[in-house]
């Protein structure tokens, strides 16, 4: 609370997350129009997130970690990972050429820039709480491995189901 610049970054982050939620609602409504059961995927995502939170909290509890610390660590890891993917969207012309819908490409470019900003804010908060030492690095690295596993498993399942729904699964 003593760092005014960080507090401003956090406030901007919260505002961007509200906008992010608004965009997801619009995206989900569009997907719903095409017959996708968005509510089902949201429920499944919620179960995965809550299960992962509890599991990771149990693993790191012996090291004095609270649920809030776990949540911050997970946020930092996930923001880093999504920003890494987002940066590819911003620089990879092949990916950009695949996006033929101008409304969707505009939304994804905005999202990519936002994710890069979020990574910086999440890391700044993480560093303010945990510092820069070996323990902070080890925690951040283990959370990233955990997050990458979840990010691989959950979306892969969703893509499989979406392809199945679209009858494009061979």
What is each stretch, according to the model?
Residues 1-170:
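Non-heme di-metal
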């Amino acid at each position: 609370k003593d760092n005014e610049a960080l507090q401003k970054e956090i406030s901007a982050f919260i505002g961007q997350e509200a906008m992010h939620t608004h965009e997801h609602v619009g995206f989900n409504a569009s997907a719903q129009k095409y017959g996708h059961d968005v509510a089902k995927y949201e429920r499944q995502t919620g179960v995965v997130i809550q299960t992962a939170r509890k599991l990771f909290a149990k693993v790191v509890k012996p090291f004095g970690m609270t649920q809030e610390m776990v949540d911050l660590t997970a946020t930092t890891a996930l923001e880093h990972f999504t920003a890494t993917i987002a940066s590819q969207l911003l620089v990879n012309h092949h990916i950009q050429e695949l996006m033929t819908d101008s409304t969707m490409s505009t939304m994804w470019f905005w999202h990519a820039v936002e994710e890069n900003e979020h990574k910086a804010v999440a890391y700044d908060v993480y560093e303010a709480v945990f510092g820069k030492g070996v323990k902070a690095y080890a925690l951040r690295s283990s959370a990233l491995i955990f997050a990458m596993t979840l990010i691989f498993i959950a979306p892969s399942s969703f893509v499989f189901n979406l392809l199945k729904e679209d009858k494009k699964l061979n």
